[in-house]
């Protein structure tokens, strides 16, 4: 937990910096408007040539709209064929790692098919939704690798998912406002850090699995069984409640789903969906518009708070951790919810699955890789579908392209889950999931960062506007 506390301190510093930057930006913008009124009466005061004001002029011009969508025609050509192949493998590996595959989808949509970056972000979310739905359906029957519980940890999802959806709404708005160069910088820093952490966690898990295999071989050799006949089974994180019964790997969906927790998650999704639809006929930045947006906060905080209080009081536990430390402090619970919001913001802003944040976080909590991947994907199903609704209402993607690519991602995710599950059973290494997660995050950092840098250089050469967009004037 000390590592998590250090992460929290670092996160708090970054948050304070961003808040200070936002306040300074708002102050300077207001000051600039006031100066423009005074300059209209006294033309002799024309001192806006300072470096600071030039920077503000670069970052914000209220009448500038830099975004124009680029949607190529939907027709059979080499771009579609190559994009389909790349999208298929991205969805297959992304669903296994619990990250969705957005880090592969966005560059593919931009570089190969030819969408503009923000439209690529929106279509990427559609593909993540398709892959997530397929993966969740595949996982609904599966059980925890060592404990007698579902492979999806519903209590963990109930703590994180409402805050994830709140973050998605913030991230979608930021996607409209933030310039591409800022998104690129944030992406590279965040993804390089999380991929490094995930790789280290994978190495640690690999070493533990090696020790477990050696111990199992020694025990069997002492009983007169050849070590070459050893089949690896993960050591249980907690004693089985039914030691005489062999744990089933698959059960019926009705038996395997925690319906109360699922009902609460669906309730949050429906409320958020209703709020998003109700904004459709409201003027951007009107009083009603902001009231509807702010109503999302009590819904998300209420449901996550309900689960957090139950965890704090010991009425609920994160059972997938096994018999480890199940007592949570207030600071830890607040930190986990904060990470949920950050994961949502990243997902909505970059068109990625929140699994890029949730996966490494769940692993740090001591959750097994299979459960981490399944639970992160389960939460992403709700958040990605909400993002798709929001992007659709903003008219950010062409429907025919989206339907086709959703179909590709849905099939690919099912294939990926099936193949990797058999591979893990064959080699006895669940750490394979963590290495896939780390690889997907790292590849995403390189591909998305590279695309962002190329686009940024192109805009500089064309002398295009590279500042913040105006959310209140955005019309799709």
Curated annotation (Swiss-Prot):
Keyword presence, DNA-binding: no
Classification via Pfam families: TauE (PF01925)
Transmembrane residue ranges: 8-28, 76-92, 99-115, 120-142, 151-171, 172-192, 257-277, 291-311, 339-359, 360-380, 397-417, 433-453
Keyword match NAD: no
Topology within the bilayer: Multi-pass membrane protein
Record key words, sorted: Membrane, Transmembrane, Transmembrane helix, Transport
Principal subcellular localization: membrane
GO cellular component, as recorded: membrane
Record localization: Membrane
Entry's family note: Belongs to the 4-toluene sulfonate uptake permease (TSUP) (TC 2.A.102) family.
Protein name, per record: Sulfite exporter TauE/SafE family protein 3
The organism of origin for this protein: Arabidopsis thaliana (Mouse-ear cress)
């Amino acid at each position: 937990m000390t590592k998590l506390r250090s992460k929290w301190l670092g996160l708090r510093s970054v948050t304070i910096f961003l808040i200070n930057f936002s306040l300074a930006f708002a102050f300077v913008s207001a000051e600039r408007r006031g100066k423009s009124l005074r300059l209209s009466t006294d033309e002799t005061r024309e001192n806006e040539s300072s470096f600071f004001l030039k920077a503000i002029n670069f970052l914000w011009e209220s009448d500038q709209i830099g975004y124009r969508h680029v949607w190529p025609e939907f027709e059979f050509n080499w771009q579609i064929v190559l994009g389909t192949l790349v999208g298929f493998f991205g969805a297959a590996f992304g669903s296994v790692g619990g990250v969705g595959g957005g880090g592969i989808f966005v560059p593919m949509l931009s570089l190969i098919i030819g969408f503009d970056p923000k439209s690529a972000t929106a279509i990427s979310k559609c593909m993540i939704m398709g892959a997530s739905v397929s993966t969740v359906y595949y996982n609904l029957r599966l059980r925890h690798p060592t404990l007698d519980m579902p492979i999806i940890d519903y209590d963990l999802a109930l703590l994180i998912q409402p805050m994830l959806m709140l973050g998605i709404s913030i991230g979608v708005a930021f996607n409209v406002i933030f310039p591409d160069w800022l998104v690129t910088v944030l992406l590279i820093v965040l993804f390089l850090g999380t991929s490094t952490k995930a790789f280290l966690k994978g190495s640690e898990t690999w070493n533990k699995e090696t020790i477990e295999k050696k111990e199992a071989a020694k025990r069997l050799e002492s009983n007169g069984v050849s070590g070459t006949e050893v089949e690896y089974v993960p050591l249980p994180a907690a004693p089985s409640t039914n030691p005489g019964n062999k744990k089933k790997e698959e059960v019926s969906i009705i038996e395997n789903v925690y319906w109360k927790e699922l009902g609460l998650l669906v309730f949050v999704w429906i409320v958020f969906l209703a709020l998003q639809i109700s904004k459709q006929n409201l003027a951007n930045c009107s009083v009603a518009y902001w009231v509807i947006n702010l109503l999302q906060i009590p819904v998300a905080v209420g449901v996550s708070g309900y689960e957090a209080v139950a965890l704090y009081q010991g009425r609920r536990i994160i059972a997938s951790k096994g018999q480890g430390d199940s007592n949570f402090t207030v600071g830890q619970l607040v930190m986990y919810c904060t990470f949920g919001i950050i994961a949502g913001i990243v997902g909505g802003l970059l068109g990625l699955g929140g699994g890029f944040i949730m996966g490494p976080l769940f692993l740090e909590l001591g959750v097994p890789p299979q459960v981490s991947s399944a639970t992160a994907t389960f939460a992403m199903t709700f958040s990605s579908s909400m993002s798709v609704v929001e992007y659709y209402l903003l008219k950010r993607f062409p429907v025919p392209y989206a339907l086709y690519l959703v179909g590709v991602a849905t099939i690919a995710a099912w294939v990926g889950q099936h193949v990797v599950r058999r591979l893990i059973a064959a080699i006895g290494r669940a750490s394979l999931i963590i290495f896939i997660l780390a690889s997907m995050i790292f590849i995403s950092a390189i591909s998305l960062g590279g695309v962002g840098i190329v686009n940024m250089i192109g805009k500089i050469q064309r002398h295009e506007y590279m500042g913040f967009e105006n959310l209140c004037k955005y019309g799709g």
